[in-house]
Amino acid sequence: MARAIMFQGTGSDVGKSVLVAGLCRVARNRGLKVRPFKPQNMSNNAAVSDDGGEIGRAQWLQALACGVPSSVHMNPVLLKPQTDMGSQLIVQGQVRGEARGRYYQELKPQLMAAVMESFAKVGDGADLVLVEGAGSPAEINLRAGDIANMGFATHADVPVVLVGDIDRGGVIASLVGTHTILPQEDRAMVRGFLINKFRGDISLFDDGLAAITRFTGWRSFGVVPWLKAVSRLPAEDSVILERAVRGDKKALIVAVPMLPRIANFDDLDPLKAEPAVEVVMVPPGSSLPADAGLVVLPGTKSTIADLLALRENGWDRELVAHVKRGGHVLGICGGFQMLGRRISDPAGIEGNVRDIEGLGLLDIETMMEPEKVVRNVEAVSLLHDEPLEGYEIHIGRTSGPDMARPFARIGDHDDGAVSPDGRIMGTYLHGVFSADRFRHHFLRALGVEGGQMNYRESVEEALDELAEGLEASLDIDGLFALA
């Protein structure tokens, strides 16, 4: 079994995913064969791994930081929320059904075998495995049968480092409180802590570090400052979208309705990085900005439910007004399905609504079918004759007259649809804006000159900068010696 260290948080969104990605790059730069692992993830931001299954995009990014192909075994259990009470269950990359509330709690102990099998496969040939927990180990109401945090750590005998987020406040209480509430067996697994997202003079927190150690007996591995490189990396949790604020007006405003079950929102990251583009996330209850040149309907885990939510917010009427003003629309995956005349779900795959009228902006119809398409693809944009690399994760088959004007060609078949005037576009492909030449041509067609950024290189540079920041702020030797 490979050496391993597990990073657990005092809560969600404390920065574990990016921290592990940065430490993966640190270990790689030190010449170690390092691999990422997350026993259980809950996210609709999924990736298609290099071996052809679904994993969290955070683990895909961590694999990139390690310089290795991504694998379904890096995230053996993935939960994709599709209703308020249930999630689609993905085990080792493949759909296993729906997990609902208490039923999933009863199912978790059975999943430990798959988790441990994947952990062994990830560790095979590795010098170090960096493990990421989920949520917080302090949620002791979920401790029985746990596979995500201390349940895994105790089962696999992996030492734990706790991560506290000082930016949200109360970090001393959150760490000391976690120490207090953990059962003795779990507390014994914790070897220390680190503080994340500090702004200002770190020396001002010296007394805080001493207080945490005094109350817990845990050693400090350091304080990570607020690192600008993090903003250039894909975010895993949609909570980060809720904090977006409008900046100075740019040449092109791209409006994105924040659908309740938004998925794969990192499709937007390359656009956000363009200096002439402002991506505006529009929360429920707010209107689409009238000055938007492009509206993107993003992917969603539940197309029909989110189409209903779109209508409840009045965004359907605003979208029609946007088109009448000469605006453009791009639908991606579930957003593409919404643009059509009708969505049918006779088997009730998505829920109780069997048939619903679409937005009618494209002359297409979608039939939901049980078979799920999960694959990485190489394609050619038929709008601009430029190569694309992306991935598909969807159910449903779409057809109709506007499919005669496809968005892209994948091998021997076409993808997507374009309206006769070219202003309404839809595709099943995620990741299209990561292709620099396509992105620049796409923006130019909207009257905006794209920058010279190479998006993939910018992600690699951000990982290197993150690693440098962690080397400078943490006791890396002490951390890696835990394994």
Curated annotation (Swiss-Prot):
GO terms for molecular function: ABC-type vitamin B12 transporter activity; catalytic activity. Residues 251-438 form the GATase cobBQ-type domain. PROSITE patterns: GATASE_COBBQ (PS51274). Coiled coil: none annotated. The active site is at residues 333, 430. Gene3D superfamilies: 3.40.50.880, P-loop containing nucleotide triphosphate hydrolases (3.40.50.300). Pathway: Cofactor biosynthesis; adenosylcobalamin biosynthesis. GO terms for biological process: cobalamin biosynthetic process. It holds the Pfam family CbiA. It comes from the Bacteria. Keywords: Cobalamin biosynthesis, Glutamine amidotransferase. HAMAP family: CobQ. This is Cobyric acid synthase. The gene is cobQ.
